[in-house]
From Swiss-Prot:
Transmembrane segments: none annotated. GO terms for molecular function: manganese ion binding; metalloaminopeptidase activity. Mn(2+) 2 binds at K264, D269, D287, E348. Belongs to the peptidase M17 family. Its EC number is 3.4.11.1, 3.4.11.10. Pfam families: Peptidase_M17, Peptidase_M17_N. This is Probable cytosol aminopeptidase. Mn(2+) 1 binds at D269, D346, E348. One of its GO terms (cellular component) is cytoplasm. It is found in: Cytoplasm. InterPro entries: Leucine_aapep/pepB, Macro_dom-like, Peptidase_M17_C, Peptidase_M17_leu_NH2_pept, Peptidase_M17_N. It catalyses: Release of an N-terminal amino acid, Xaa-|-Yaa-, in which Xaa is preferably Leu, but may be other amino acids including Pro although not Arg or Lys, and Yaa may be Pro. Amino acid amides and methyl esters are also readily hydrolyzed, but rates on arylamides are exceedingly low; Release of an N-terminal amino acid, preferentially leucine, but not glutamic or aspartic acids. One of its GO terms (biological process) is proteolysis.
Length: 494
């Protein structure tokens, strides 16, 4: 799909146009002009009750009197001044469904007339593009017979003026690219997407951007570094663990401290010796959702060429049962030197992450954000709507909350205090790898915090938001929009 910004006179439109109508029958500015051109044609339709302006209602008009456009899509915009982001995205979804049902190849959208509550033109256009891209995404690489998509639409033009509108399109396209990249990797089956495959994707990204350099550490490299907790998780798998470092450097000051994003990359997690239930185990291919999202973010910022230094780290690994697998009761010495008693081999993500969080100290980062499908407890607490946010730095937490609100990629901050460290005490080691039944998402974050004292740190638990279940089963690409928005804000000083 191609997206463009162009100030277009209504009278000059020959193809297809999208305009808005409010629930009380009030016409948007563009609809009002067409009503005047057509000598009250739209007003007559409103009076007859053929269109009511109900949110998401779409009426397709052809042969509008005195008007040369092939089709006019009249879209119900609900109550004027009350439409929120979620409603606007649904409006766009309903509109694109109506357009796709026709043979329209090009549409010119005047929905920039529609005011989203507490938002401006930038967000109107950006949400439009992001929603359109979500609606057309399909993952069919492994189907012998592809879906028949008889969709003619190839061009969407936003009738607007100024740099803000073009910036919205540019940002949205880059974010959509990142989301798509994250989805493609996460949806890939685990017999294909193993740690080596993840590393190959990282290397391929470096070939597509001159701003990126990739380094991959294998198990021998990690053993030499003392990353024993990470390696213990991998012991049960024949597929070697891979730690992929994607270095993006484009800051005006080449020595500027980097922002580091760490993604948990368990390409399959059977739970190890503490085996998971069979039902739903196929979804554990999504346990690399953190690494997938970091990979997606790196794609997006390379497209945007943000003036930042950012390092994306994909901590690839598998957790499988085997005669060589690590066991409950094992005590592991981490790269940091702290010892950890393994009480549950299915609490493996924190073991992979703790060594990775220690490893990234060498970059002297400005800040570190780890992203992980870490705990079922986070899903119980927040459901599938909000990612869990934990941080030892209030400023960083607030910046992430702002980016979450701006992008509508929601996150909710969870508490973190010394009392949660009490739950991680072990009689035999410095730490236990689980903290008991209560507050599991928080104790997981508390565990990780023991390895982050050298920098500002935040943790995003995306166990509930990384993929969907049911009829729409598949990766969501979250929290790519949140993280890219955070980086845009960092680049612009907001």
């Amino acid at each position: 799909m191609e997206y463009r910004v162009k100030s277009t006179a209504l009278l000059d439109i020959k193809s297809n146009i999208i305009i808005g109508l409010y629930e009380n029958g009030e016409l948007s500015p563009s609809a009002q002009k067409i009503d005047e051109i057509s000598q009250g044609y739209l007003s007559k339709l409103i009076q007859s009750g053929e269109i009511k302006g109900k949110l998401g209602q779409v009426l397709v008009l052809r042969h509008v009197p005195n008007y040369s456009a092939e089709r006019v899509f009249v879209v119900g915009a609900g109550k004027k001044g009350e439409i929120n982001e979620k409603q606007f995205k649904q409006l766009i979804q309903d509109t694109i469904n109506a357009v796709k049902a026709t043979s329209a190849k090009e549409v010119i959208s005047y929905l920039s007339d529609i005011k989203i509550k507490d938002r401006d033109l930038y967000w109107n256009i950006r949400f439009s593009v992001e929603t359109l891209e979500t609606s057309i995404y399909q993952f069919e690489q492994f189907k012998s017979k592809k879906s028949e998509q008889d969709v003619a639409l190839t061009d969407v033009i936003f009738s607007a003026e100024g740099d803000v509108a073009q910036q919205a399109v540019n940002h949205a396209k880059a974010i959509a690219l990142g989301v798509r990249a994250a989805k493609d990797v996460a949806n890939c089956p685990p017999n294909v997407c193993n740690p080596v495959y993840l590393a190959e994707q990282a290397n391929a990204l470096a070939t597509r951007s001159d701003l990126i350099k990739t380094t991959v550490l294998g198990e021998k490299d990690m053993a030499d570094l003392g990353m024993n907790a990470y390696l213990a998780v991998s012991q049960g798998s024949v597929n070697e663990a891979q730690l992929s470092l994607i270095e993006y450097r484009n800051h005006p000051n080449p020595d500027a401290k980097p922002i580091v994003l760490v993604g948990k990359g368990l390409t399959f997690d059977a739970g190890g010796i503490s085996l998971k239930p069979a039902e739903g185990m196929d979804e554990m291919k999504y346990d690399m959702g953190g690494a997938a999202s970091v990979y997606g973010v790196m794609n997006a910022i390379a497209e945007l060429k943000l003036p930042l230094n950012v390092i994306g780290v994909l901590a690839g690994c598998e957790n499988l049962p085997d005669g060589n697998a690590y066991r409950p009761g094992d005590i592991l010495t981490t790269m940091k030197g702290l010892t950890v008693e393994v009480l549950n081999t299915d609490a493996e993500g924190r073991l992979v992450l703790c060594d990775t969080l220690t490893y990234v100290e060498r970059f002297e980062p400005e800040l570190v954000i780890d992203v992980a499908t870490l705990t079922g407890a986070c899903v119980v607490a927040l459901g599938a709507h909000n990612s869990g946010l934990i941080s030892t730095d209030d400023k960083l937490a607030k910046d992430l909350e702002l980016a979450a609100a701006q992008s509508t990629d929601k996150a909710w901050r969870l508490p973190l205090g010394e009392e949660y460290q009490e739950q991680l005490k072990s009689n035999f080691a410095d730490l236990a790898n689980i903290g008991g039944r209560w507050g599991g998402a928080i104790t997981a974050g508390a565990f990780l915090s023991n390895f982050t004292d050298k920098y500002r740190w935040a943790h995003l638990d995306i166990a509930g938001t990384a993929w969907l279940q049911g009829a729409n089963k598949g990766a969501t690409g979250r929290p790519v929009p949140l993280l890219v928005q955070f980086l845009i804000n960092q680049a612009t000083g907001k």
